[in-house]
Amino acid sequence: MRPTSITAIRPAGRPTAAARGSASGGSGGLCCVVLDTGRRLRVTIDDVARCGLLEGASLAPEIVARLVARDAYLGARERALRLLAIRPRSADEIRVRLGQQRVPREIARAVIADLTAAGYLDDLAFARFWVTQRRAARRYGPRRLRWDLRRKGVSAAVADQALSEAVGGDEEARGADERAAAALVQRALAADRRLPPDRRVRRLAALLERRGFTAETIARTLRTIGVLAPLESSDG
């Protein structure tokens, strides 16, 4: 079998800003190694020096295999970094997305490990971001946020820490939850005002429960807005 040789080594396409300085990228500069088979493989400048790659040089099969693996790794890392450039993500989200793109598991694991070590992947930072964004939108309570985080692969301990930091026992945080719940109730009341009081309360409570608000927040919100008053007066 004729040995594979290098026909050209040229600069690769421009990577993302994060890719240029991320883990396992060496100097971060990327090259395209063109083989005489027509195949193009991405490697870093450091890879070129480390493997002694030169135009016209013949490559042993094990070197070709190493370059192929390196190309696959760099491609997967670039995809992951592009996803992270859009918004923070959990490590499990990256794992799932790389799997959907048919990235081999061992390469995906290596990418996730390297990006975690470099600080680009951080489940706690992602959880804090997610909680902050969802609370700012005033749409969901802490139980729903915890469920969302767990669904995205964040551990229970990390999810609880992020929620504790955001909500905890702080009166201001509880007030923010109640304001969010009240906004949902006010919007729903327009469609529910003709219902009997007991049925209206059940529907509003179910709405807030689905959105992840605690029983305490639900009761305080409904009482503050006044929808519990007809029931409480009839009980008295």
Write out the residue ranges for each language-model feature.
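An alpha-helical, amphipathic repeat domain used for nucleic-acid recognition
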Residues: M1-G236
